[in-house]
C-alpha cells in the first residue's frame, strides 16, 4: 500500500438541483469532497438545450447564469480548502453542434463532458425503432461523432446504453461496433470516463465495464473517473475501486481536466491520496 499523499484527485462529474433530478446545494457536495480526501470538485450539471430538448432533466437556458453563480459562490466559500471549478455535461446528438459550440463559449469552463443519453425522450423519439441491438449500434456511432465534433473533453458513462435492456446486452455481439467507435475516438485524443454510478444502475457495474475498458486501454484512450453525483454523499464514491479497475485494464495513469487541459496523475499516487 503506497504511503498517504496530499489530495490530488477531483470529483469531475457532479450535479446541482437545477437539473431537476439532483439534490443538495453545491456547498454540501464540497463538504463531501473534503471528507473523501479530494483536492477539488468540478460541477458538471446538465447543460441547457434548445427547443425544449428533454427540459425535465436539465436547467433552462435562463437558469444558466444562476448555475454559474451557484458554483462561484461555492468557489469563494471554499477558497484555500477545496478547488471548486465550473464545468458542464452537455448532451450530444447530431444537429446540436452549433448550439453547444456557442454555449461552451459563454463562460470559461474547466471540464466539458459529452453524453449520449439513450433514455431521454427527445433522443428516443428520434433514434429508437424498437430494435434494441440497432439502438446500441446508434449509441456507439453517436459517441464517436461526439468525439469527432471537437466539443468535448471527456465522453461520460460510455456504455450507458447497456441499461436500456440488460437482458439484451451481449458484449461479444456489440464488440465489433464498440471497437470501430473506439478506434475513431482514440484518433481524436478525447478522453473517456470511468463512471462509478454504474454500480447503482439496472446492470450493476461501472460504466464502462471491464471488457470495454480493456479495449480503451489497448488504444491508449485517456480516462477520467467521476461519480456522477446527484446527491452530496456520492461525491468521490467508488474511486479506489475505479482506480484498481483501471490498473487491471492496463492503465498506469488517471486524468483530471482543468482549464480544459488534461493532467495525468499516476494511479499509485492517486490511490495514496484518498481518505
Language-model features, listed with the residues they occupy:
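Acidic (Asp/Glu)-rich catalytic clusters
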Residues: 2-9, 34-35, 68-81, 100-113, ...
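Structural preference for beta-strand elements that scaffold enzyme active sites
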Residues: 7-11, 40-42, 81-87, 110-113, ...
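Charged catalytic cores and adjacent phosphate/nucleic-acid-binding surfaces used
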Residues: 1-16, 26, 169-275
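Active-site gating/metal-coordination segments in enzymes
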Residues: 73-129, 133-134
Amino acid at each position: 500500500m503506497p504511503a498517504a499523499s496530499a489530495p490530488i484527485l477531483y470529483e469531475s462529474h457532479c450535479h446541482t438541483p437545477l437539473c431537476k433530478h439532483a439534490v443538495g446545494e453545491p456547498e454540501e457536495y464540497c463538504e463531501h469532497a473534503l471528507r473523501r480526501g479530494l483536492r477539488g470538485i468540478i460541477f458538471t450539471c446538465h447543460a441547457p438545450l434548445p427547443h425544449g430538448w428533454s427540459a425535465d432533466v436539465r436547467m433552462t437556458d435562463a437558469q444558466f447564469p444562476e448555475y454559474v453563480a451557484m458554483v462561484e459562490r461555492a468557489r469563494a466559500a471554499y477558497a484555500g480548502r477545496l478547488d471548486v471549478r465550473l464545468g458542464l455535461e452537455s448532451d450530444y446528438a447530431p444537429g446540436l453542434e452549433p448550439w453547444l459550440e456557442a454555449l461552451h463559449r459563454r463562460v470559461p469552463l474547466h471540464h466539458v463532458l459529452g453524453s449520449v443519453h439513450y433514455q431521454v425522450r427527445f433522443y428516443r423519439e428520434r433514434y429508437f425503432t424498437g430494435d434494441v441491438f440497432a439502438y446500441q449500434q446508434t449509441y456507439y456511432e453517436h459517441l464517436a461523432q461526439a468525439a469527432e465534433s471537437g466539443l468535448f473533453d471527456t465522453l461520460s458513462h460510455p456504455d450507458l446504453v447497456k441499461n436500456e435492456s440488460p437482458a439484451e446486452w451481449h458484449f461479444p455481439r456489440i464488440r465489433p461496433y464498440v471497437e470501430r467507435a473506439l478506434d475513431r475516438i482514440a484518433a481524436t485524443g478525447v478522453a473517456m470516463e470511468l463512471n462509478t454510478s454504474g454500480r447503482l444502475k439496472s446492470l450493476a457495474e461501472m460504466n464502462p465495464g471491464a471488457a470495454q475498458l480493456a479495449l480503451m486501454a489497448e488504444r491508449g484512450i485517456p480516462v477520467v473517473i467521476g461519480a456522477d453525483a446527484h446527491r452530496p454523499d456520492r461525491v468521490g464514491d467508488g474511486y479506489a475501486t475505479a482506480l484498481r479497475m483501471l490498473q487491471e485494464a492496463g492503465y498506469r495513469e488517471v486524468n483530471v481536466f482543468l482549464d480544459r487541459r488534461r493532467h495525468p496523475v499516476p494511479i499509485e499516487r492517486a490511490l495514496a491520496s484518498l481518505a
